[in-house]
A protein has these predicted regions:
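Non-catalytic connector elements of ABC transporters
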Residues: 243, 253-360
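The feature captures the beta-strand-to-loop junction immediately N-terminal to the Walker
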Residues: 41-43
Length: 360
């Protein structure tokens, strides 16, 4: 987590309730560094968008304080916070040209006509849209409209830009392209970005750090690789990427490792991450690409192939390891496809360090 001394955005014990009874955000403490790209990731209703709206000034915190560059902003209206915003629906004025859309936030800030024209052109050049300055939004594609919305959020040189699921309406290929464009702009400008999405691939691709939300709380705050490789609880392991899980009970504990007995009496050696003592229930988490089609590693079992699905760069293999559990295995695409057959029995194994013992 960021040191408090270099924090640009701070949520200090922030709570939010809409009905005065239930909390949709629960005691949120979060420090975001200047120039950082932080993503709030989580399912619908997890509290992530409410946090963004409180930071923007469109919602008020029920309790706690939000600070921007060291100053409390709870009572400052949205238009005086100096924050750029990008929405999923673009929110462009349909009766204005592209140039007029970008000029509007500068007019509100009493920028001179000469400086407005200069800043508008600079912003359009950043997103490679200067040739479209005289077009109306209806004459643009979805991707072009999103670029204009992005340029408008940056045109007045804000220190902080908030993005609320900005790529949700785009098709897959364009969405992936825009992810890289936004990340490159962030690097180029050094602006602080707080990004909200439920799409894990967006979060992992673009972010410096990701805050995973569920039930109004941050479940884990980490770098993208930290979330994927070292999930701290069963929710994060299941929400980030694909995950195989086994339920069991802890049989023994030895420093950082545990032996877990599953419901089918299989004993599994795992890394102790977030679990209790001997006799308590736990959930084991193993990523599909960490399972090997051999008996080389300490955790091994014979499995039966149920399904083979071709994915281009890899083959997705669904296997049954016992009467209660199926696993997914990702196999790099090679000639192995022709050697595997549905119904075939194969040995599989995985390393202790790739198997995490988490909360039940």
């Amino acid at each position: 987590m960021s040191n408090k001394n270099d924090s640009f955005v701070v949520f200090d014990r922030v709570q939010k309730s809409y009905d005065g009874l239930s909390l949709v955000v629960k005691d949120l403490n979060l420090h975001i560094k200047k120039g950082e790209f932080l993503t709030m990731l989580g399912p619908s209703g997890s509290g992530k968008t409410t946090c963004l709206l409180m930071l923007a000034g469109f919602e008020t915190a029920t309790h706690g304080e939000i600070l921007l560059d060291g100053k409390p902003i709870n009572n400052i209206p949205p238009h005086k916070r100096g924050i750029g915003m990008v929405f999923q629906n673009y929110a462009l004025f349909p009766h204005m040209t592209v140039g007029e859309n970008l000029s509007f936030p500068l007019e509100v800030r009493k920028i001179s006509k000469h400086d407005r024209e200069k800043k508008v052109m600079q912003a359009l050049e950043m997103v490679q849209m200067s040739d479209f300055i005289n077009r109306k939004p209806a004459q643009l594609s979805g991707g072009q409209q999103q670029r204009i919305a992005l340029a408008r959020s940056l045109v007045f040189n804000p220190d902080l830009v908030l993005m609320d699921e900005p790529l949700g309406a785009l098709d897959k290929q364009l969405r992936e392209h825009m992810q890289y464009e936004i990340k490159n702009l962030h690097k180029q400008l050094g602006v602080t970005v707080v990004y909200v999405t439920h799409d894990q691939s967006e979060a992992l691709t673009m972010s410096d750090r990701v805050a995973v939300f569920n039930d109004g709380q941050i479940q884990q705050l980490s770098t993208p690789d930290g979330l994927y490789e070292r999930p701290e609880n069963a929710f994060v392991a299941q929400f980030i990427g694909e995950n195989n899980k086994l339920a069991g009970q802890i049989k023994s504990v030895n420093n950082r490792e545990v032996i877990v007995k599953t419901s089918q009496n299989m004993e599994v050696k795992a890394l102790k991450v977030n679990c209790g003592d001997v006799g308590t229930d736990t959930t084991l988490s193993i990523r599909p690409e960490r399972i090997h089609l051999n008996s080389k590693y300490i955790n091994k079992v014979d499995a039966t192939i149920k399904q083979l699905i071709y994915h281009g760069d890899h083959i997705r293999c669904l296997i049954k390891i016992d009467k209660d559990n199926d696993f997914i295995v990702k196999i790099p695409n090679s000639n192995i496809k022709s050697t595997l057959k549905i119904g075939e029995k194969i040995p599989i194994s995985w390393d202790t360090m790739d198997c995490h013992a988490l909360d039940a």
